[in-house]
């Protein structure tokens, strides 16, 4: 084939994602399929896709590339990313490809690639090789042409997800669920049949034009309808998912967004109470609460660089039972170390049923003991210069310096992490203190001002 004339901007650290036409198209998808087949020689793959208008055609193109490269392909159709992970490890396939751009606007699309067992193909583990071969078009001739076959995986997937909780403990709850017009209702509609809950549903209809805004519950404007509905309905809990439902977000009974670090601590306590001594993986952003939970219940906290590929690699290496990023990615050993947006809320409802306490009550002490800033995105023209300026100002007085991801500095009763975004000219800022909200505000403003000044 001729070399591909297309921007390379779609190739990110963990996946391929970009504007349809300019950065991602059917030609690229076909070539990625061919390159994957040429480099890894898979026997059988699965391919799934999300609800974006461009997804079915891109999925067909990548399947054609895989079969032309000699691989058989299981077409699992419209699904969430974790369903692609599930199909890969549950059916013993050589790998999988998901067509999705997660929470990005509808004019974006992308490809998420995994090997056997759901192991990610990222820039450090083969994605750059796939990029080079896809753009060169220098594919070897396959010895045979692969075949495509369709398979319905939903029921097997649902059975797996339900196995993470004890259904006999579930008690009636009123829950508001918001799918943001993404894929979540594919799984949610089937899961709810097995649960004794009353649901009020928001934006469940899959619609890749995202008429109610991008499906990104990290954004306050996306949380607003869910918060209002929880209060209006006097519901027990609010849950929301991003576009491909590999992330799950929580609104408590008071209509308040629960920061990811407290959800990590809560789920860590769930696993450690049942499996004392196990290993819990956390990212470098804010983790004092998670460390305390581990000490309390006899667990072992292990830090990993942020990003799903790094988290999964660390979990596999140390055999962690559970891991999470504060960005709402939750990873489970018994889900082949992959992330799921459905397992977390089932665990939370089991905890609520078991204890008779609402989510807000369960995290209140954590919020008081370890207040956090939440993740703040700060523009940075020169990321390295900005990080160096902050480090020069604060490192001399730090009790500990953590180079795991960006700049992490720890002091007597506060700490912060600044790390570059993998995809945008931004620095992501997170901070926590030991019970001191006024110190949190003081130091947060101080550091944000320094970042702003270093960009002038």
Which residues fall in each region the model found?
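Gly/Ser/Thr-enriched, mixed-charge loops and adjacent short helices
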Residues: 109-233
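Glycine-rich phosphate-binding loop
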Residues: 94-102, 108, 230-252, 257, ...
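Proline/glycine-rich low-complexity loops and linkers
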Residues: 127-159, 163, 253-326, 330-332
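An N-terminal, well-structured beta->alpha segment
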Residues: 1-64, 68-70, 148-173
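Phosphate-binding and adjacent anionic-ligand microenvironments
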Residues: 275-456
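N-terminal small/polar loop signature for handling phosphorylated ligands or for N-terminal nucleophile
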Residues: 45-109, 162, 191-251
């Amino acid at each position: 084939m001729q070399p591909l004339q297309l921007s390379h901007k779609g190739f990110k650290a963990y996946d391929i994602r970009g504007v349809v036409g300019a950065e991602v198209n059917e030609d690229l998808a076909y070539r990625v399929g061919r390159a994957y087949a040429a480099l890894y020689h898979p026997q059988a793959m699965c391919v799934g896709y999300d609800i974006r208008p461009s997804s079915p055609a891109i999925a067909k193109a990548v399947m054609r590339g895989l079969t032309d490269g000699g691989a058989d392909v299981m077409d699992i159709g419209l699904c969430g990313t974790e369903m692609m992970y599930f199909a890969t490890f549950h059916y013993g396939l050589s790998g999988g490809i998901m067509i999705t751009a997660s929470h990005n606007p509808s004019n974006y699309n992308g490809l998420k690639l995994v090997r056997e067992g759901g192991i990610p193909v990222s820039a450090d583990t083969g994605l750059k090789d796939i990029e080079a071969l896809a753009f060169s078009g220098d594919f070897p001739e396959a010895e045979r042409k692969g075949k495509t076959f369709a398979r319905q995986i939903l029921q097997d997937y649902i059975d797996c997800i339900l196995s993470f909780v004890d259904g006999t403990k579930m008690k009636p709850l009123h829950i508001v669920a918001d799918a943001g017009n993404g894929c979540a209702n594919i799984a949610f509609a089937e899961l709810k049949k097995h649960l004794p809950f009353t649901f009020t549903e928001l934006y469940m209809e899959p619609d890749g034009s995202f008429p109610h805004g991008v499906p990104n519950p990290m954004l306050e404007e996306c949380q607003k309808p869910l918060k209002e509905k929880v209060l209006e309905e006097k519901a027990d809990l609010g849950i929301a998912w991003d576009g491909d439902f590999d992330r799950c977000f929580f609104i408590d009974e008071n209509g308040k967004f629960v920061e990811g670090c407290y959800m990590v601590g809560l789920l860590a306590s769930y696993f450690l109470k049942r499996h004392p001594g196990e290993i819990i993986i956390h990212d470098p952003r804010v983790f004092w609460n998670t460390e305390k939970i581990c000490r309390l219940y006899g667990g072992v906290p292990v830090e990993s660089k942020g990003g799903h590929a790094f988290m999964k690699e660390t979990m596999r290496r140390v055999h962690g039972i559970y891991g999470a990023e504060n960005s709402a990615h939750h990873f489970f050993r018994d889900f082949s170390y992959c992330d799921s947006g459905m397992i977390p809320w089932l665990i939370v409802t089991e905890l609520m049923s078991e204890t008779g306490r609402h989510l807000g009550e369960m995290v209140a002490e954590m919020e008081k003991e370890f207040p956090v800033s939440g993740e703040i995105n700060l523009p940075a023209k020169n990321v390295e210069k900005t990080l160096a300026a902050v480090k020069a100002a604060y490192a001399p007085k730090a009790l500990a310096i953590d180079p795991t991801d960006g700049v992490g500095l720890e002091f007597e009763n506060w700490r912060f992490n600044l790390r570059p975004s993998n995809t945008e000219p931004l620095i992501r800022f997170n901070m926590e203190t030991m019970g001191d909200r006024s110190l949190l505000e003081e130091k947060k403003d101080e550091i944000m001002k320094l970042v702003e000044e270093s960009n002038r």
